[in-house]
């Protein structure tokens, strides 16, 4: 079964109905693929929606993700260490949240779906880049 890790930007594209990411989310909802997101990226998603649309909308969208087919992954010891290693390797290029997504994709042997151009240049995992 296909596995994806979704970064914050891709989740935001999904929120606005971007057709480029729709097929990936359809695969998950139909049970043909699995998708994961880190708690850290979910926090980033919440605050970006809160900044633009307010806390009430952020709460609704946050709970929709929690109740969707996306697996929300907590930062356990293995993921935290791997994200730290990635941040050390890509210091100055990738945010800590991006390093968590990258580490999760590596641990899950998943394709990382991202809108981040710097993250798209990394070759640690398979990446599908959606320019914005």
List PLM regions with ranges.
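Conserved beta-strand segments of alpha/beta enzyme cores
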Residues: 34, 71, 126-128
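Amphipathic alpha-helical segments within well-ordered protein domains
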Residues: 43-46, 84
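Acidic, PIN/NYN-like endoribonuclease modules and their adjacent C-terminal/linker elements
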Residues: 1, 102-132
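Anion (oxyanion) recognition and catalysis
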Residues: 29, 66, 106
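Active-site neighborhoods of divalent-metal-dependent phosphate/nucleic-acid chemistry enzymes
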Residues: 71-113
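Histidine- and aromatic-rich ligand-binding microenvironments
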Residues: 6-7, 37-38, 94-95, 116, ...
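Alpha-helix capping/helix-boundary segments
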Residues: 10-11, 41-42, 79, 101, ...
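Short, well-structured N-terminal submotif of metal-dependent ribonuclease cores
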Residues: 1-37, 50-63
